[in-house]
Amino acid sequence: MARILGVDIPDNKRGEIALTYIFGIGRSSANQILAAAGVNKDKRVSSWTDEESQTIRTVINENYKVEGELKSEIRLNIKRLVDIGCYRGRRHVLGLPVRGQSTKNNARTRKGKRKTVANKKKAAKK
């Protein structure tokens, strides 16, 4: 297994797919990285040379925020929204959808498990 930026990259996968195991790198940016490094995207990770691995590392380090650096930036962005007290920040605090989705019926992922409230008992008829 090749290690790039502290992440184990699977040997049996193509380079284009293997790089997506790094947080912050998707298919599109993986293709851009491999093109900049001059590595064929269909080449398996196990057949990469040490020089190719090193050039991929340098391209990622110079041009992309990945893993811990990206996660901390995301965390700081959310903290900033909460601190200034804007609508999006309040939605983050309440654990509700941030991007304007309706919450009357759905939004179970953000709201969590249902909190069922019992109905009032109806008075017996005479």
UniProtKB/Swiss-Prot annotation:
Presence of the UniProt keyword Manganese in the record: no
Biological processes annotated in GO: translation
Biased composition (Basic residues): 107-126
Molecular function terms, GO-annotated: rRNA binding; structural constituent of ribosome; tRNA binding
InterPro entries in the record: Rbsml_uS13_C (IPR027437), Ribosomal_uS13 (IPR001892), Ribosomal_uS13-like_H2TH (IPR010979), Ribosomal_uS13_bac-type (IPR019980), Ribosomal_uS13_CS (IPR018269)
Keywords of the record: Ribonucleoprotein, Ribosomal protein, RNA-binding, rRNA-binding, tRNA-binding
Keyword tRNA-binding: yes
Family: Belongs to the universal ribosomal protein uS13 family.
Protein known as: Small ribosomal subunit protein uS13
Source species: Amoebophilus asiaticus (strain 5a2)
